């Protein structure tokens, strides 16, 4: 053990640079740390020194070297950090853990959870920055002021209304730190002004911690803006300096000037290239000022080493190790991230975090291999194991090749970049099947295919890659408790006391939009005493949207659901990234949102098996449809799920036009929608015929048997047996379809909902008018799963859910979800996906494949339209011949009289009047003018067009106007 005889002598530490130095370097011997210790260090070292003095008095040994004392202090702080971590984070229930929690919470209150982090940060800083010239006192003082201000703000916000000294309240507020300063200021001034003062103190403490002066804030803001915009940083006052723009890669050190070639980094190592100013003027970053080593003095850095060698040494150190290669978004061309590639084993293939398996030359079913963005590969129908999961497709290799060359240029210079570019170019030129024919870069325009097209051979052989879940926005963390919840609890308790109801609030569950408060009743208290107070409770909490559950399912308590003052947005990306969604590989899984407990809610459309969605305008119905469709796009390939979208509004689902999952272009005509539903019925019957022939009860079992090679076509048949994809039919507005073709639509929906579950066909119906003429009894009886958003009346709520409750929802995604098999609906906050997120996901799948439409659907629509045009109008009935004669008489005579039709056609007055009304509805004559004859609207030369229109041979009456003589002849 290394010790010294007395505390006045110190042992010099070894220099960290034990190897040979570069030519021209000057070694500087470390100076002795004889500076008096600051006060904060004496306080921290008081207990260890007292313990050490006692040990030395007993053993008679000398004092440790100051360097070892400093190391001992650092490890003591780390031990304390571990102990407080056990008590504050993991809630160790032992006596020692309770004592530590009492100390930490009593001093810091709620901020005791950050105490382990602070202790570890102080220990880390003492290890790296100590001794002469250290700025540790300033940093520690700044942290103390920051903690004091935060604790005071918490004390004023939570415990200011409580009088007296109660340690239990202080532990759940700001602790002693906040009480000694927060309570006096709140009592002397007010809560608002006290918080303002503490905010100012907190800002000042941040300046102390970072070592930033107020005059440096504009310069720091310019640096941050330059990094965000990815532009070179130009100091204030040097914007018009011509030398900087003429030599952007020039480095000046003393009297030495060296200009580097383009592509070689000439700054201090930052990848953004924003710190290319002079070395003497550059200020350290925020992280360096907090945790970096102590900077050298001006005398030490002038002769340290030849500064022009730094970029070359850095490039040489990266060669053979790792290099950061940017990954380019194939849709926008922007750099979306960086992946580490080993330079020594670089083979020209970019290593992506979301690998795309290469198509094997000997495997014809490689197009059925599904690539999960997390790196997991799942074999699709007929596909085998992927040999090389890191090999990208030809289009991806062509896109990422430029990124790989750029990363190699920044790491190993121009020569290494040329070699890397040659390697990636050779790989990108190879076809997926090994033919060596370059595929080029796919079209990234994002324009959907306007006409029905088929997949090309390149699309069929190219592996399909699912979009990365990182395309979807991440939301804010869920708040478990806010001051608003405490105010509501006090209001509920006061209401029960005012009406002499023996009930108390025992807990609450905070959701994103509403909070459910659990109320327990005393002995002998009826539930009706609380439910009858609904209006009084709404008055007490200042909210009209109060919903009471009596009781809460599975609990002996009454639930009072009250909207939150500070609502949270549930992002679809958070739902799909949750453990519940990631652990379920079902491609038909859809993200619903969050329940009142803050848990993520998902729905498997194959188990629902059909869904009815209803809600008033602005309630969040369209947002749910977008979330459901985006979930399908993010999780399913076109081989797994095919979509039929019906959008009578023409604009709600237009963003999904051209995606490869579509079976037909988005249908906007209600008549064509009825024909599409009839096609779905025929497809369902065909699937049931296959299931019956091959002996399966569900399409899922049939698909598994096909993938396993257990199902084969009959001998002599030319058919190729392939797995059936799920078919999802989405109708955005049910009311428009029921108005145009109610009988056909209702019968088709009835057959689909009754039989289509085992065939893999599922239906989602949405409407904003949930009346009995739209959601009929036949439709509702076969759709067990319901999702009700805010409705305008309790009657509409009963139509959807068969119970009231939807009329009390607050809108904007607040919904009641009743899945199949559930006794009572679940209140959820629907997930939200923005238009930009939808556009990114849609463009990602568009660039991989073109939609492959079913031609028989369009053919059925054309045949039905032709058949309707050939059939006589039901309004005319058997009077077609008489009507044609009446039209000929009226047009040729230019006299629209009912009495003339009576005489000429020998019909009664009632039938003559009916014929005249039919001619008026078809634009032949004008409206009735009393006893006068009606005006004839067409000319005699237009008689053939009129007769053809009445027969139904043309779609419109095209009357030719008389030609005007040309002037100027």
Swiss-Prot record:
Family designation: Belongs to the FtsK/SpoIIIE/SftA family.
Residue ranges of every copy of the FtsK domain listed in the record: 598-798
UniProt free text on domains: Consists of an N-terminal domain, which is sufficient for the localization to the septal ring and is required for cell division, followed by a linker domain, and a C-terminal domain, which forms the translocation motor involved in chromosome segregation. The C-terminal domain can be further subdivided into alpha, beta and gamma subdomains. The alpha and beta subdomains form the DNA pump, and the gamma subdomain is a regulatory subdomain.
Subunit description: Homohexamer. Forms a ring that surrounds DNA.
CDD domains: TrwB_TraG_TraD_VirD4
Membrane topology type: Multi-pass membrane protein
Gene3D superfamilies xrefs: 3.30.980.40, P-loop containing nucleotide triphosphate hydrolases, Winged helix-like DNA-binding domain superfamily/Winged helix DNA-binding domain
Compartment annotation: Cell membrane
Spans within the Cytoplasmic topological domain: 213-969
Name of the coding gene: ftsK
Ranges annotated as biased composition (Polar residues): 1-10
Keywords per UniProt: ATP-binding, Cell cycle, Cell division, Cell membrane, Chromosome partition, DNA-binding, Membrane, Nucleotide-binding, Transmembrane, Transmembrane helix
Basic and acidic residues bias (residue ranges): 15-30
Gene Ontology cellular component list: plasma membrane
Classification via Pfam families: FtsK_alpha, FtsK_gamma, FtsK_SpoIIIE
Positions of the UniProt region annotated as Disordered: 1-31, 260-291, 311-367, 438-468
PROSITE patterns in alphabetical order: FTSK
GO biological process, alphabetically ordered: cell division; chromosome segregation
UniProt GO MF annotations: ATP binding; ATP hydrolysis activity; DNA binding
Main location group: membrane
Binding positions for ATP per the UniProt entry: 618-623
Role: Essential cell division protein that coordinates cell division and chromosome segregation. The N-terminus is involved in assembly of the cell-division machinery. The C-terminus functions as a DNA motor that moves dsDNA in an ATP-dependent manner towards the dif recombination site, which is located within the replication terminus region. Required for activation of the Xer recombinase, allowing activation of chromosome unlinking by recombination.
Stated name of the protein: DNA translocase FtsK
Membrane-crossing segments per the record: 72-92, 102-122, 139-159, 169-189, 192-212
């Amino acid at each position: 053990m290394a010790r010294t005889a007395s505390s006045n002598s110190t042992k010099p530490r070894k220099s960290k640079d034990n190897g040979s130095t570069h030519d021209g370097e000057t070694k500087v011997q470390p100076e002795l740390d004889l500076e008096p210790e600051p006060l904060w260090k004496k306080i921290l070292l008081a207990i260890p020194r007292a313990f050490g003095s006692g040990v030395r008095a007993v053993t008679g040994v000398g004092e440790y070297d100051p360097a070892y004392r400093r190391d001992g202090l650092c490890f003591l702080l780390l031990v304390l950090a571990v102990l407080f971590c056990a008590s504050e984070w993991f809630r160790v229930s032992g006596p020692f853990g309770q004592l530590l929690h009492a100390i930490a919470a009593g001093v810091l209150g709620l901020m005791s959870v950050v105490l382990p982090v602070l202790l570890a940060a102080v220990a880390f800083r003492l290890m790296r920055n100590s001794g002469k010239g250290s700025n540790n006192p300033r940093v520690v003082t700044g942290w103390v002021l920051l903690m004091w201000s935060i604790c005071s703000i918490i004390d004023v916000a939570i415990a200011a209304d409580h009088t007296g000294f109660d340690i239990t309240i202080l532990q759940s507020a700001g602790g002693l730190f906040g009480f000694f300063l927060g309570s006096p200021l709140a009592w002397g001034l007010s809560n608002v002004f006290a918080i303002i003062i503490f905010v100012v103190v907190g800002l000042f403490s941040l300046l102390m911690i970072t070592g930033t002066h107020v005059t440096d804030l504009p310069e720091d803001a310019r640096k941050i803006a330059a990094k965000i915009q990815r532009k070179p940083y130009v100091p204030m006052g040097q914007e018009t300096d011509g030398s900087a723009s003429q030599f952007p890669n020039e480095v000046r050190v003393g009297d030495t000037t060296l200009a580097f070639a383009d592509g070689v980094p000439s700054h201090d190592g930052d990848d953004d290239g924003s710190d290319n100013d002079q070395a003497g003027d550059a200020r350290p970053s925020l992280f360096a000022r907090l945790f970096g080593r102590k900077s050298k003095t001006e005398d030490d850095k002038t002769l340290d080493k030849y500064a022009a060698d730094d970029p070359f040494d850095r490039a040489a150190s990266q060669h053979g190790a790792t290099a950061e290669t940017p990954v380019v978004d194939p849709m926008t061309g922007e750099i979306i991230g960086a992946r580490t590639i080993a330079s020594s084993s670089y083979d020209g293939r970019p290593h992506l975090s979301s690998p795309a398996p290469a198509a094997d030359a000997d495997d014809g079913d490689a197009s059925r291999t599904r690539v999960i963005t997390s790196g997991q590969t799942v074999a699709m129908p007929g596909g085998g194991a992927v040999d090389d999961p890191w090999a990208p497709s030809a289009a991806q290799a062509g896109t990422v090749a430029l990124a790989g060359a750029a990363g190699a240029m920044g790491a190993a210079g121009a020569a290494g970049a040329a070699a890397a570019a040659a390697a990636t170019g050779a790989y990108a030129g190879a076809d997926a099947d090994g033919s060596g024919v370059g595929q080029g870069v796919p079209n990234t325009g994002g324009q959907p295919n306007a006409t029905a097209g088929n997949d090309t051979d390149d699309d069929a052989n190219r592996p399909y890659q699912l979009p990365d879940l990182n395309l979807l926005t991440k939301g804010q963390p869920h708040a478990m408790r806010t001051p608003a919840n405490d105010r509501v609890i006090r209001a509920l308790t006061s209401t029960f006391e005012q009406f002499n109801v023996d009930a108390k609030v025992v807990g609450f569950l905070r959701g994103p939009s509403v909070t459910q408060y659990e109320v327990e009743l005393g002995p002998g208290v009826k539930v009706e005493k609380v439910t009858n107070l609904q209006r009084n409770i709404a008055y007490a909490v200042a909210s009209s949207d109060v919903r009471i559950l009596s009781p809460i399912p599975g609990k002996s308590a009454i639930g009072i659901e009250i909207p939150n003052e500070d609502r949270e947005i549930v992002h679809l990306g958070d739902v799909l990234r949750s453990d519940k969604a990631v652990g379920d590989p079902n491609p038909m899984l859809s993200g619903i949102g969050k329940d009142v407990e803050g848990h993520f809610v998902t729905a498997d459309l194959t188990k629902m098996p059909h869904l009815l969605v209803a809600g008033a305008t602005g309630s969040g119905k369209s947002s749910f449809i977008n979330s459901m469709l985006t979930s399908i796009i993010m999780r399913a390939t076109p081989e797994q799920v095919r979509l039929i979208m019906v959008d009578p509004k023409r604009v709600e689902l237009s963003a999904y036009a051209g995606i490869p999952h579509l079976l037909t272009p988005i249908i906007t005509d209600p008549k064509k929608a009825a024909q599409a539903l009839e096609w779905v019925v025929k497809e369902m019957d065909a699937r049931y015929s296959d299931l019956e022939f091959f002996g399966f009860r569900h399409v899922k079992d049939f698909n598994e048997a096909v993938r396993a090679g257990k199902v084969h076509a009959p001998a002599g048949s030319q058919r190729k047996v392939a797995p059936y994809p799920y078919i999802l039919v989405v109708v955005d507005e049910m009311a428009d379809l029921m108005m145009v073709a109610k009988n056909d639509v209702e019968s088709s929906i009835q057959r689909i909902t009754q039989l289509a579950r085992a065939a893999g066909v599922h239906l989602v119906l949405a409407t904003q008018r949930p009346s009995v003429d739209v959601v009929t009894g036949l439709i509702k009886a076969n759709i067990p799963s319901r999702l009700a958003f805010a409705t305008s009346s309790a009657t509409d709520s009963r139509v959807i859910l068969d119970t009231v409750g939807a009329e009390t929802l607050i809108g904007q995604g607040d919904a009641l979800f009743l899945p199949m098999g559930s006794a009572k609906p679940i209140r959820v906050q629907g997930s939200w996906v923005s238009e930009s997120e939808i556009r990114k996901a849609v463009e990602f799948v568009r660039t991989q494949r073109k939609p492959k439409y079913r031609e028989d659907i369009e053919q059925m629509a054309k045949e039905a339209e032709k058949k309707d045009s050939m059939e006589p109008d039901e309004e005319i009935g058997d009077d077609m011949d008489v009507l044609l004669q009446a039209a000929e008489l009226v047009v040729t005579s230019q006299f629209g009289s009912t009495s003339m039709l009576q005489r000429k056609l020998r019909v009664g007055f009632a039938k003559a009047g009916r014929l005249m009304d039919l001619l008026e509805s078809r634009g032949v004559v004008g409206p009735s003018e009393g006893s006068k004859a009606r005006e004839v609207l067409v000319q005699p030369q237009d008689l053939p067009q009129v007769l053809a229109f009445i027969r139904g041979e043309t779609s419109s009456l095209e009357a030719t106007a008389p030609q005007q003589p040309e002037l100027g002849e």
